[in-house]
């Protein structure tokens, strides 16, 4: 007996020495005997021991083989299950435990291990769940270190799971996810290659004696795809104290924090981990954490663009059924969340909170018809038009309607003749600032838009588009009074002013009124010292474009569409040959030839084409130069007579000589053309003789007119020359002229 007591004391001394050399393990991990096995290796290789130094891992004591108990099954040395935790025994009972071990030796039974001394803990019921099924793993392979960083959340203390004490695997100074590696998430890492980070073989649970969750057969994997993992387990014990009797045969387990119950212990454990701030399931795309795997699967649908739940009313899709049900409350009359100020109902609490905040700040924009709230006042006004129709703002002067008050305000400035924007170059006034900006480009000489047919350049793109319609030879708009046709509708509208007594355009300096804007613009040059129209053949400059045209005809012999002084044919010259001269004559500034009150008369020239005043003007405005009231040269007052240019007024005595020279040149050209036609057997010789006679008659009539006039005027001569022509002949000649120009 004394011999046996001595052996027990020796074992106690040996046990004390082993305890001093062994670190304290958490209560959830039990030491495992390693008799007959290779010594346990460090869980991390040499390359990774530096980053994982905070885990404070130390090798187990080397003399654990001296322990009298080993874990052996019946005839098998492989451990198949976790060791059962034993309640703590008092040190006085250790002798009895040792004696029992000796008796078990004698009977051939497997020995029980001696536990490390631990503080007293409450005893647990035999029906405890081992959370090895939800254990966490480390992926040791460096291939998984390329993942995305995951949001870190510290552990929150709770009544169920108190603040953890410092342990080798969960140190206090570090959060739950320590900064081991920027791509590594503790307690486990999710490979970025898989679409869903967790599968049925992600967790490798231990095999408890009575597993609560049945294990499914794992698929066979090759050695290349298997991942080497080291297990770090966390256990939460769920005993019968969580059980709640709800009646019937169904068992439910209730959370003591929020009193939420579950039919499965596993679901309750997952719920408790959520209270502690643990969300083990992470999204590989955005790094968002979730408590349950099903929540992660639902979240992954948002990244895949899949929304299986669709609203039948507005066809809006959602990823979850709960979101669809909450959305359907908007289409129903049931609004559970009501405003305490105005009583308006809302489907969501967030909408009610935002609505009440507007009441507090006084920024609510609520429709009085349907009660809808809008972020801005402009959106509310736009919405009111659906109930009341579009708001119309009527002009009290002309009964025009406008959609916006700003449009009506700009329109009223025209009736009041208010033009606040004045050009500093020419003094023209405008109602809108952008009109002044467009006009200023004419003074700068900027012409960026060019016609692709005739090469004429324009300042504005709209003017160029309007000009291109001239080349189409399509005049769809016709005046019902004079049967004149126009390319554009607005040109016809401006033409109709000619047939009325209204003269809306008035000069503010002299009070003279005009029925067209371009006539007023040309008149304004008379009050200024500017002479923008310059002759190409001499240094002469003119205020009006019409004066320049007359100067070119009289002084330099440049007739309509031709350069007779250069010996070119009349009216048959290709448009490309005269494009350079014509572009130089074209100016953006309009001209005024209607200051004297004259009747609209057709113009006829010796080449059989019609001349409409200034032929350098646009086609749709050429025919309107002489459409004014009748005029008599002798009866017109001196103040209203046409202002002639300096070349005609100062050198009027040389005008007949210049005209005689021009007539001689025309006769020579006509005789040459007649001789060519006869040599070729042309049957149109009679027409040439008629044109020759017409040229001689024109020259003779001009001489008679100059001899009877003290102050010769070329415009008066044109009036007497063409006063007997009819409008029908003018239109026919104009169509012939356009056909020649277009090569038809």
Curated annotation (Swiss-Prot):
<feature type="region of interest" description="Disordered">
    <location>
        <begin position="206"/>
        <end position="228"/>
    </location>
</feature>
<protein>
    <recommendedName>
        <fullName>Zinc finger protein 366</fullName>
    </recommendedName>
</protein>
<keyword id="KW-0677">Repeat</keyword>
<feature type="zinc finger region" description="C2H2-type 6">
    <location>
        <begin position="393"/>
        <end position="415"/>
    </location>
</feature>
<dbReference type="InterPro" id="IPR050636">
    <property type="entry name" value="C2H2-ZF_domain-containing"/>
</dbReference>
<dbReference type="InterPro" id="IPR013087">
    <property type="entry name" value="Znf_C2H2_type"/>
</dbReference>
<feature type="compositionally biased region" description="Basic and acidic residues">
    <location>
        <begin position="213"/>
        <end position="228"/>
    </location>
</feature>
<keyword id="KW-0804">Transcription</keyword>
<dbReference type="GO" id="GO:0033147">
    <property type="term" value="P:negative regulation of intracellular estrogen receptor signaling pathway"/>
</dbReference>
<feature type="region of interest" description="Disordered">
    <location>
        <begin position="664"/>
        <end position="692"/>
    </location>
</feature>
<feature type="zinc finger region" description="C2H2-type 2">
    <location>
        <begin position="281"/>
        <end position="303"/>
    </location>
</feature>
<keyword id="KW-0805">Transcription regulation</keyword>
<feature type="zinc finger region" description="C2H2-type 1">
    <location>
        <begin position="253"/>
        <end position="275"/>
    </location>
</feature>
<feature type="zinc finger region" description="C2H2-type 8">
    <location>
        <begin position="449"/>
        <end position="471"/>
    </location>
</feature>
<dbReference type="GO" id="GO:0000122">
    <property type="term" value="P:negative regulation of transcription by RNA polymerase II"/>
</dbReference>
<keyword id="KW-0479">Metal-binding</keyword>
<keyword id="KW-0678">Repressor</keyword>
<dbReference type="GO" id="GO:0003700">
    <property type="term" value="F:DNA-binding transcription factor activity"/>
</dbReference>
<dbReference type="InterPro" id="IPR036236">
    <property type="entry name" value="Znf_C2H2_sf"/>
</dbReference>
<keyword id="KW-0539">Nucleus</keyword>
<keyword id="KW-0863">Zinc-finger</keyword>
<dbReference type="GO" id="GO:0003714">
    <property type="term" value="F:transcription corepressor activity"/>
</dbReference>
<feature type="zinc finger region" description="C2H2-type 4">
    <location>
        <begin position="337"/>
        <end position="359"/>
    </location>
</feature>
<dbReference type="GO" id="GO:0000978">
    <property type="term" value="F:RNA polymerase II cis-regulatory region sequence-specific DNA binding"/>
</dbReference>
<dbReference type="GO" id="GO:0008270">
    <property type="term" value="F:zinc ion binding"/>
</dbReference>
<feature type="zinc finger region" description="C2H2-type 9">
    <location>
        <begin position="477"/>
        <end position="499"/>
    </location>
</feature>
<dbReference type="GO" id="GO:0005634">
    <property type="term" value="C:nucleus"/>
</dbReference>
<feature type="region of interest" description="Disordered">
    <location>
        <begin position="603"/>
        <end position="627"/>
    </location>
</feature>
<feature type="zinc finger region" description="C2H2-type 10">
    <location>
        <begin position="505"/>
        <end position="527"/>
    </location>
</feature>
<comment type="subunit">
    <text>Interacts with ESR1 and NRIP1. Interacts (via PXDLS motif) with CTBP1.</text>
</comment>
<comment type="function">
    <text>Has transcriptional repression activity. Acts as a corepressor of ESR1; the function seems to involve CTBP1 and histone deacetylases.</text>
</comment>
<dbReference type="Pfam" id="PF00096">
    <property type="entry name" value="zf-C2H2"/>
</dbReference>
<feature type="zinc finger region" description="C2H2-type 7">
    <location>
        <begin position="421"/>
        <end position="443"/>
    </location>
</feature>
<dbReference type="GO" id="GO:0043627">
    <property type="term" value="P:response to estrogen"/>
</dbReference>
<feature type="zinc finger region" description="C2H2-type 11">
    <location>
        <begin position="533"/>
        <end position="556"/>
    </location>
</feature>
<feature type="zinc finger region" description="C2H2-type 5">
    <location>
        <begin position="365"/>
        <end position="387"/>
    </location>
</feature>
<feature type="zinc finger region" description="C2H2-type 3">
    <location>
        <begin position="309"/>
        <end position="331"/>
    </location>
</feature>
<dbReference type="GO" id="GO:0030331">
    <property type="term" value="F:nuclear estrogen receptor binding"/>
</dbReference>
<feature type="short sequence motif" description="PXDLS">
    <location>
        <begin position="590"/>
        <end position="594"/>
    </location>
</feature>
<feature type="region of interest" description="Interaction with NRIP1">
    <location>
        <begin position="455"/>
        <end position="744"/>
    </location>
</feature>
<keyword id="KW-0238">DNA-binding</keyword>
<keyword id="KW-0862">Zinc</keyword>
